[in-house]
Amino acid sequence: MTVYLLANFGGPRISQEIPSFLHALLTDQDVTGGRIPPWLHRPLFSYIAKRRAHRVAEQYAYLGGRSPIFQDTEKLAQNLSQELQAPVISFHRYLTETHQDTLAALRESAGDIIGIPLFPHYTFAVTGSIIRFFLERIPEKPMAWITHFGVHPQFISCMREHIQDCLIAQGIVAEDCFFLFSVHGLPMRHIRLGDPYAKQCQDSFNALIGESEGVLSFQSKFGIGEWLVPSTKEICQSLCTKKRYIVVVPFGFVSDHIETLYEIDHLYVPMLLQRGYRVVRVPAINTSDRWVSALASIVKSSPHETILEPLLMPKRR
């Protein structure tokens, strides 16, 4: 029987897991490497993670000291398993406390393994990092991967209906709205290495926006250097539109977590409100029945990648 691996970013379940979560994230060379020699990378970013832990803990305090992404991913895995009538194992990339259980479950599995990273758009830094994680730890277990689904008809229709439901609940029509579609940012050096992320985000945005008025922007810049533009922060500071409502859609994130619940809700939405706009923030699709059904269709109809080395960020030596 085929076994499915549902992979997400992970997030601290309790405040005590914030330091280890941040350390795992920032010491991942697929995320923060590239310009720094490998011998220096881990000690440098271990130090940075320790320095940033208090500030990040203050941000998580707005969420009750934890991220909902763990529970939402677990629930989604259970519901997807019922929909597919097949085993679904969860994986939380930067929640290291859960890794041994995931690896043990995969080692015990007897069937084919298909990985499903919960990221609509492929990037070396996230989906590539997840693929590398398993190539390095269980090379004896061949895996196939669904690497992206940002223009899959089921994802597009799911997002359109989800946004429409949100507008209906607010008594708003799309003609009165300017849509701000926000996705995670990425350093330009990744794009220059051949990362397809920017093009996939643009293609996905084009498929979603239709005849509506809107913009694609990039959030969550970290560190120095050139990143994809325009940034969500800059758009919120400078946007001029005659539309009655700004609808913020974090469509690069299928799960609400710190980058939606803190960064968007507590940093960017207030910027727009202070400038006199009426703002609607569309929640992530999370564990909705519509998303479970759409994801099952995506799993059944998407191609599976098995030649994996070209999908990984070139390593600096």
Swiss-Prot record:
GO terms for biological process: heme biosynthetic process. It is found in: Cytoplasm. Its EC number is 4.98.1.1. Pfam families: Ferrochelatase. InterPro entries: Ferrochelatase, Ferrochelatase_AS, Ferrochelatase_C, Ferrochelatase_N. Keywords: Cytoplasm, Heme biosynthesis, Iron, Lyase, Metal-binding, Porphyrin biosynthesis. One of its GO terms (molecular function) is metal ion binding. Fe cation binds at residues 184, 259. Pathway: Porphyrin-containing compound metabolism; protoheme biosynthesis; protoheme from protoporphyrin-IX: step 1/1. It catalyses: heme b + 2 H(+) = protoporphyrin IX + Fe(2+). It comes from the Bacteria. Its main location: cytoplasm. One of its GO terms (cellular component) is cytoplasm. NCBIfam families: hemH. Catalyzes the ferrous insertion into protoporphyrin IX. Belongs to the ferrochelatase family. This is Ferrochelatase. It comes from Chlamydia muridarum (strain MoPn / Nigg). The gene is hemH.
